[in-house]
């Protein structure tokens, strides 16, 4: 059992945002069949958003992708249709200004155990770095409305440690690190971007080392509660993120690449590693920073 911001999780493995469609049937099937400690919803906004037109997703190399769905989602109202599901639900919320976050959060019911504020999407204008100028205001307003733990999802920017500090000082209960890294690919036949949006978020194994560095630096400065996300493809990757400060580890691209069965593989791999070392998972957290 792992306690994060007062919430108990069976083990460190959760599903990151953007993977599981926000429908009761799909979520319930994933919960029952694969037993993740929690599912993080797709980012939901107050009003529905249309996704960018195709192509929105392209494979860069083995275990590495570029995507720009553009936060397409049915809106926060879908939450009332989810009902009770048998694993914990973390709701990801997005917006282009403070009021949109407030409006969306005001619609949240008792289903989620935690709220994740996505202030770092690189794939829709006005929904990413522009939010950082008022991250404190977003956090303070959300915390004044909800009693659930609030985590802030940040991207791998150069000033990430400073921004993390601002979010925590404003009252965030923890951080989700990291979001995707903005990139671009060009078609050499017509010399236009391959993705319809132009740029996209780089995800997968190619950002794992970046995630390790960011989590390390933020944990070293503040020792906050962290959900670590970024290129986790096996139990070693998960242990690595835990060793630099993550309490929970989110799986994303690996589920696209290998399917949901990998959840069990990674969980069992962590268990075997800990048993062989004679360690508990809490003894590993942050050890790579403190040594």
Swiss-Prot record:
The active site is at residue 121. Its EC number is 1.3.1.14. It holds the Pfam family DHO_dh. Keywords: Cytoplasm, Flavoprotein, FMN, NAD, Oxidoreductase, Pyrimidine biosynthesis. It is an enzyme of class 1 (oxidoreductase). InterPro entries: Aldolase_TIM (IPR013785), DHO_dehydrogenase (IPR050074), DHOD_1B (IPR033888), DHODH_Type1 (IPR053488), Dihydroorotate_DH_1 (IPR024920), Dihydroorotate_DH_1_2 (IPR012135), Dihydroorotate_DH_cat (IPR005720), Dihydroorotate_DH_CS (IPR001295). PROSITE patterns: DHODEHASE_2. It catalyses: (S)-dihydroorotate + NAD(+) = orotate + NADH + H(+). Substrate binds at residues 42, 67-71, 118, 179-180. One of its GO terms (cellular component) is cytoplasm. Binds 1 FMN per subunit. One of its GO terms (biological process) is 'de novo' pyrimidine nucleobase biosynthetic process. Pathway: Pyrimidine metabolism; UMP biosynthesis via de novo pathway; orotate from (S)-dihydroorotate (NAD(+) route): step 1/1. One of its GO terms (molecular function) is dihydroorotate dehydrogenase (NAD+) activity. Its cofactor is FMN. FMN binds at residues 17, 42-43, 118, 153, 178, 204, 230-231, 252-253. Catalyzes the conversion of dihydroorotate to orotate with NAD(+) as electron acceptor. Heterotetramer of 2 PyrK and 2 PyrD type B subunits. NCBIfam families: dihydoor_dh_Arch. Belongs to the dihydroorotate dehydrogenase family. Type 1 subfamily. This is Dihydroorotate dehydrogenase B (NAD(+)), catalytic subunit. The lineage of its organism: Archaea, Thermoproteota, Thermoprotei, Sulfolobales, Sulfolobaceae.
């Amino acid at each position: 059992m792992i306690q994060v911001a007062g919430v108990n999780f069976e083990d460190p493995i959760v599903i990151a945002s953007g993977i599981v469609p926000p429908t009761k049937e799909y979520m319930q099937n994933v919960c029952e069949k694969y037993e993740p400690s929690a599912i993080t919803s797709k980012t939901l906004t107050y009003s529905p958003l249309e996704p960018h037109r195709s192509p929105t997703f392209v494979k860069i190399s083995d275990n590495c992708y570029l995507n720009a769905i553009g936060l397409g989602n049915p809106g926060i109202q879908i939450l009332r249709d989810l009902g009770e599901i048998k694993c914990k639900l973390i709701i990801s919320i997005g917006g282009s200004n403070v009021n949109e976050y407030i409006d969306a959060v005001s619609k949240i019911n008792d289903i989620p155990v935690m709220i994740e504020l996505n202030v770092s999407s690189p794939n829709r204008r006005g929904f990413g770095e522009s939010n950082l100028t008022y991250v404190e205001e977003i956090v303070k307003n959300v915390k004044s409305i909800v009693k659930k733990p609030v985590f802030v999802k940040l991207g791998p920017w150069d000033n990430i440690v400073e921004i993390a500090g601002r979010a925590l000082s404003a009252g965030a209960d923890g951080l989700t690190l990291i979001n995707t890294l903005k990139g671009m690919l060009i078609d050499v036949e017509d010399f236009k971007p391959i993705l319809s949006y132009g740029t996209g978020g780089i995800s997968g194994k190619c950002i794992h080392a970046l995630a390790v560095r960011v989590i390390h630096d933020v944990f070293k400065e503040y020792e906050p509660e962290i959900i670590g996300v970024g290129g986790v493809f096996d139990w070693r990757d998960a242990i690595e993120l835990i060793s630099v400060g993550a309490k929970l580890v989110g799986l994303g691209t690996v589920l696209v690449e290998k399917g949901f069965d990998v959840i069990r593989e990674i969980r069992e791999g962590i268990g075997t590693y800990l048993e062989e070392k004679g360690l508990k998972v809490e003894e590993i957290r942050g050890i790579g920073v403190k040594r």
